Amino acid sequence: MKTRTVLFSIAGTVLAFAALDAAVAFFATRDSLAGPLDLSNVSKIRVEGAASDIAISTASEGPHVAELKGERHGWGAVWHSGWYSDACPAQGSMRIEGDTLTVDVGRAARFFDWSDCTMELTASLRPEAAVIIDQQAARTRLAGDFSVVDIRSDAGDVSLRGHAQAISISGAALRAKVTFERVMQNETIAISGKMLEATLKFLTPTPVSYLVEAVASYVDSALPNTPGAKPEITIRGEMVHTRIE
């Protein structure tokens, strides 16, 4: 009987901790680390650091601003929000030099940190801005008209809807979805990754040229390959799945 009681007590404790852990998973605190900053005179954004969730848009009308936030999830968010004042992480920062906004999202969370921290960048700029991202991991959502989009990320999830004259996306494991709302016949698109899933969609029917180089590839194109035409698409990788429509 004593053995059974002990076993039930242990089982009850495990279930209680499991329930508490599940509840804490829904607990999050959000810290505003920097901004909003005025981007009226900014035409280029550069994002550095470990990892972040990025949303950048362009519009002729303002306000043109940027804000960096950190959102904590998990056990540490419960205690950290009430007892500590330092942000998530404290070294996340933004600075403007000339026409360039540089965003540093800081280091990745350590293995023994009590909470996971998601760095979130939101920005609105004037059309034809340039976006440069160099991170270990990034989820990037772009909407609007851009001059240059240059993204280097070991693990990346990229979506762009609008237009960009030059697109370069590279990394190890990538998923990219690019939707062109208009075409100027001067676009170049280069996407490369070891494991790559890429979808390119043109809302206006247009001739395109494309080159796919991969160890193993599956290319599904609704548009014929027209040598010399632009948009010019180059895709390289080891395992590649590409759709062009």
Regions found by a protein language model. Name each.
Residues 145-147:
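Charged, glycine-enriched surface loops/patches
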